[in-house]
């Protein structure tokens, strides 16, 4: 057993941990990074963002091949199994892991692969797979342990046909019909993936419409697209029992309905990874969802301990977690942070087609009694979309009628998560620089999807009187 001292300890090597570790070493601090698994990257790289987006990309290309007359004359259909596209995802995961491992090595972070448990405010025990352990100490410690799928105790996740969003990546059979319980971001993304592979999908939503945090038009567009593709959405439903049987799974709903399929993906909620940290030893307590409370510089109620990423809840985005880590690193060394997380964080939802938004929704602006106007552009009217055969989609700009300040941008369609950043860049400008007129007065490359901003801006300004 070793006793080793560092300036800072980072628990977790996902986006939040990486942001914190890189921020600390750039300020000349000695840093230990503790990762419970053998590979760095956290849930984002191995079970969440990277694999699901790699799967989605592969499926969307299959759909494009089968629907585009340039590639297919409908005499044959390109098919691929879930296992085959998983192999592609594994290649991307391996590339990401090697790259991130290199970040830590080049920057002199000391890596420890084991389970971290607090001993006191400055000491952490690291227990390894062989049951040996070391004790690390530091002036400051940051928790970036992420989250895991919520698994209710009355659901038998040991059954071979019942999965959560982590274990679904080990799917070893070819389902013809899948039930997805939970219609949040993860549930909707996997509904797109499975339907794109030709699998029947029942999407059980515990709420009254999809992704309620989105602008209503974006939510409605996704609902229609799902319906048009053959996904069966069951709103306002909750299970009373989930029964694993020999040939699949039966979901008994409280409404009296029963749904049977070859397998079930349970995707309803996540839990912070805090239960094994020994938080009581440092005077901390997680809430019922395993989440920690922090202040604006990501400091917990223990002044020596900080927390970032999924383990603190909203916004639970990999991009935000990395920035939170950088901000916390600055606060840990200087006592405060000169930079803060931006107010309007873009959201990307990688369904097929994808959705992205930044800023306020129409519902929010109406409730706030803000005099706004709407500018719209349909992808089907853009030359680049026609060339690429990506006619499904639209861009919507919400702006103040009097000041012309951009208040929100919402995009539905292929490349939405890329397109959104053009508008975000203008929204982040201060004062008169944030104006919808920028898109009219600038020159766009032609033909491009970005040109949707000019079309939407003209459409919106023409509504003013």
Swiss-Prot record:
<dbReference type="GO" id="GO:0004148">
    <property type="term" value="F:dihydrolipoyl dehydrogenase (NADH) activity"/>
</dbReference>
<dbReference type="InterPro" id="IPR050151">
    <property type="entry name" value="Class-I_Pyr_Nuc-Dis_Oxidored"/>
</dbReference>
<keyword id="KW-0521">NADP</keyword>
<dbReference type="InterPro" id="IPR016156">
    <property type="entry name" value="FAD/NAD-linked_Rdtase_dimer_sf"/>
</dbReference>
<comment type="function">
    <text>Conversion of NADPH, generated by peripheral catabolic pathways, to NADH, which can enter the respiratory chain for energy generation.</text>
</comment>
<dbReference type="InterPro" id="IPR036188">
    <property type="entry name" value="FAD/NAD-bd_sf"/>
</dbReference>
<dbReference type="GO" id="GO:0005829">
    <property type="term" value="C:cytosol"/>
</dbReference>
<keyword id="KW-0560">Oxidoreductase</keyword>
<dbReference type="Pfam" id="PF02852">
    <property type="entry name" value="Pyr_redox_dim"/>
</dbReference>
<dbReference type="Pfam" id="PF07992">
    <property type="entry name" value="Pyr_redox_2"/>
</dbReference>
<dbReference type="InterPro" id="IPR001100">
    <property type="entry name" value="Pyr_nuc-diS_OxRdtase"/>
</dbReference>
<comment type="similarity">
    <text>Belongs to the class-I pyridine nucleotide-disulfide oxidoreductase family.</text>
</comment>
<keyword id="KW-0285">Flavoprotein</keyword>
<dbReference type="InterPro" id="IPR004099">
    <property type="entry name" value="Pyr_nucl-diS_OxRdtase_dimer"/>
</dbReference>
<protein>
    <recommendedName>
        <fullName>Soluble pyridine nucleotide transhydrogenase</fullName>
        <ecNumber>1.6.1.1</ecNumber>
    </recommendedName>
</protein>
<dbReference type="GO" id="GO:0006103">
    <property type="term" value="P:2-oxoglutarate metabolic process"/>
</dbReference>
<keyword id="KW-0274">FAD</keyword>
<dbReference type="InterPro" id="IPR022962">
    <property type="entry name" value="STH_gammaproteobact"/>
</dbReference>
<dbReference type="GO" id="GO:0006739">
    <property type="term" value="P:NADP metabolic process"/>
</dbReference>
<keyword id="KW-0963">Cytoplasm</keyword>
<dbReference type="GO" id="GO:0050660">
    <property type="term" value="F:flavin adenine dinucleotide binding"/>
</dbReference>
<dbReference type="InterPro" id="IPR023753">
    <property type="entry name" value="FAD/NAD-binding_dom"/>
</dbReference>
<dbReference type="GO" id="GO:0003957">
    <property type="term" value="F:NAD(P)+ transhydrogenase (Si-specific) activity"/>
</dbReference>
<keyword id="KW-0520">NAD</keyword>
<feature type="binding site">
    <location>
        <begin position="35"/>
        <end position="44"/>
    </location>
    <ligand>
        <name>FAD</name>
    </ligand>
</feature>
């Amino acid at each position: 057993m070793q006793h080793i001292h560092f300036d800072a300890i980072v628990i977790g090597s996902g986006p939040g941990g990486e942001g914190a570790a890189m921020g600390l070493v750039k300020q000349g601090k000695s840093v230990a990074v503790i990762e419970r698994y053998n590979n760095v990257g956290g849930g984002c790289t191995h079970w969440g963002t990277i694999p699901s987006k790699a799967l989605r990309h592969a499926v969307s290309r299959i759909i494009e091949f089968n629907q585009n007359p340039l590639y297919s004359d409908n005499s044959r259909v390109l098919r691929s199994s879930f296992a085959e596209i998983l192999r592609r995802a594994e290649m991307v995961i391996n590339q990401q892991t090697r790259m991130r491992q290199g970040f830590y090595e080049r920057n002199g972070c000391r890596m420890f692969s084991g389970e971290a448990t607090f001993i006191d405010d400055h000491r952490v025990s690291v227990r390894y797979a062989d049951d040996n352990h070391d004790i690390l100490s530091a002036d400051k410690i940051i928790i970036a342990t992420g989250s895991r799928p919520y698994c209710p105790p009355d659901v038998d996740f040991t059954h071979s046909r019942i999965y959560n969003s982590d274990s679904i990546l080990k799917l070893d059979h070819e389902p013809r019909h899948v039930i997805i319980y939970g219609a949040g971001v993860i549930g909707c993304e996997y509904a797109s993936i499975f339907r794109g592979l030709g699998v029947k999908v029942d999407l059980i939503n515990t709420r009254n419409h999809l992704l309620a945090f989105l602008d209503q038009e974006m939510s409605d567009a996704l609902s229609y697209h799902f319906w048009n593709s053959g996904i069966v959405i069951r709103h306002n439903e909750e299970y009373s029992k989930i029964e694993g049987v020999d040939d699949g799974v039966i979901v008994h709903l409280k409404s009296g309905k029963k749904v049977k399929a070859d397998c079930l993906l349970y995707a309803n909620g996540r839990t912070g990874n805090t239960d094994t940290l020994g938080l009581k030893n440092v005077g901390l307590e997680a809430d019922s969802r395993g989440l920690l409370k922090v202040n604006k510089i990501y400091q917990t109620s223990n002044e020596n301990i900080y927390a970032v990423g999924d383990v603190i809840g909203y916004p639970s985005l990999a991009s935000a977690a990395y920035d939170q880590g950088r901000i916390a690193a600055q606060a840990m060394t200087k006592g405060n942070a000169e930079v803060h997380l931006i107010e309007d964080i873009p959201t990307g939802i990688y369904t097929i087609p994808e959705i992205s938004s930044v800023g306020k929704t129409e519902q929010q602006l109406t409730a706030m009694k803000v005099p706004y106007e709407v500018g719209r552009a349909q992808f089907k009217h853009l030359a680049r979309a026609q060339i690429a055969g990506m006619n499904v989609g639209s861009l919507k700009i919400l702006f103040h009628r009097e000041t012309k300040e951009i208040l929100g941008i919402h995009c539905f369609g292929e490349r939405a998560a890329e397109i959104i950043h053009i508008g975000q860049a203008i929204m982040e400008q201060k004062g008169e620089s944030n104006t919808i007129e920028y898109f009219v007065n600038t020159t766009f490359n032609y033909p491009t999807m970005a040109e949707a901003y000019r079309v939407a801006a003209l459409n919106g300004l023409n509504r003013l009187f």
